[in-house]
Amino acid sequence: MSKSRDTEIKLFGRTITSLLDVNCYDPSSLSPVHDVSSDPSKEDSSSSSSSCSPTIGPIRVPVKKSEQESNKFKDPYILSDLNEPPKAVSEISSPRSSKNNCDQQSEITTTTTTSTTSGEKSTALKKPDKLIPCPRCESANTKFCYYNNYNVNQPRYFCRNCQRYWTAGGSMRNVPVGSGRRKNKGWPSSNHYLQVTSEDCDNNNSGTILSFGSSESSVTETGKHQSGDTAKISADSVSQENKSYQGFLPPQVMLPNNSSPWPYQWSPTGPNASFYPVPFYWGCTVPIYPTSETSSCLGKRSRDQTEGRINDTNTTITTTRARLVSESLRMNIEASKSAVWSKLPTKPEKKTQGFSLFNGFDTKGNSNRSSLVSETSHSLQANPAAMSRAMNFRESMQQ
């Protein structure tokens, strides 16, 4: 009796299932057995394709003739006929590979055709002989640069007159050539990068800021320095000079209520030279106006009342008019007086009737006070601010 069973074949790690009805007892149902190795002509072909072939060595497979054709299309790895030479795996899967080969060949042909057409176009593009005038300034001083990358019909031109690029059939660029400061250094359009110094300004009338004459706000000198010459800082002359500096801010701005723009009396009185083309005047200071008569700060005492001042000749000078004396100028005078008094062996016998900064130097029988006068006068005469604070402190201690 014949028995049917399923057999599994493993080739190269892959299982192949097939229905093989094998009847070992019925010799009539078996097909003649073919020996692959018996034919010497086919042995060479089998040995050459043994690396890719699923069959290794001579195989004896008894198969029915009726099932031979039915199992032919089930799996490509099953040999359909032993009479034919075995095929490789690449040859079995030939439909897909043939399609890929066709696609590759078509791509190669398209690339060759495009390369030939591009070569023809590149040879066809030539520099135009006719120059197009600039549409902006209508000058004929133009230059052909190159063809547009996207459209061959729009070449790029450059105008040497107005320094602009434009494309034929397109819009013109309003941006000049270059990237700002590096390219525009030699062009007249780069004047806004220049910095105007004080030498470029018209300083012909700058000498009239200081004028000499008598005024209510004049700076007077007392003692040895009292002569007929007085220096005046006029605000009207400063306001008249604003017309000569066109394009700049005024060097001094007058504030309302006679207030000073600087909060401290030792601040610099001139403007910054890097912003305003106005030279410094180190000998002149801005007058400080008094805020109240009872103020205890230095440099802000009113002089409306008549006061008695003593100079080196011990003669009193009465002032009937209100005068504003510069603080730094007064400090220099008083420092020179203190230096002269410290060198003298005796102190002045008379005391000032009015309020004076040098009441602290008057001796009251204390021997240490005389030594302090000689020491502080030499050490503090270089710094008027520190000397005035020390004197004010001593006056307050005596009171």
Swiss-Prot record:
The protein's UniProt keywords, in alphabetical order, are: DNA-binding, Flowering, Metal-binding, Nucleus, Transcription, Transcription regulation, Zinc, Zinc-finger
Q: What single Pfam family name could you report for this chain, choosing any that match?
A: Zn_ribbon_Dof
Q: What does this protein do?
A: Transcription factor that binds specifically to a 5'-AA[AG]G-3' consensus core sequence. Regulates a photoperiodic flowering response. Transcriptional repressor of 'CONSTANS' expression.
Q: Which PROSITE patterns match?
A: ZF_DOF_1, ZF_DOF_2
Give positions of region: Disordered. Answer: 29-125, 212-232
Q: Name one GO molecular function term.
A: zinc ion binding
Task: Write out the biased-composition intervals (Basic and acidic residues).
Answer: 36-45, 64-75
Q: Name one GO cellular component term.
A: nucleus
Write out the annotated subcellular location.
Answer: Nucleus
Enumerate the residues binding Zn(2+): 134, 137, 159, 162
Where are the zinc-finger regions (Dof-type) in this chain? 132-186
Phenotype of the disruptant? Answer: Early flowering.
UniProt induction comment: Circadian-regulation. Highly expressed at the beginning of the light period, then decreases, reaching a minimum between 16 and 29 hours after dawn before rising again at the end of the day.
GO BP term, example: flower development
Q: Which ranges are annotated Low complexity under compositional bias? A: 109-118
Q: Where is the composition biased (Polar residues)?
A: 91-108, 212-221
Upper lineage: Eukaryota, Viridiplantae, Streptophyta, Embryophyta, Tracheophyta
What name has this protein been given in UniProt?
A: Cyclic dof factor 5
Q: Which domain of life is it from?
A: Eukaryota
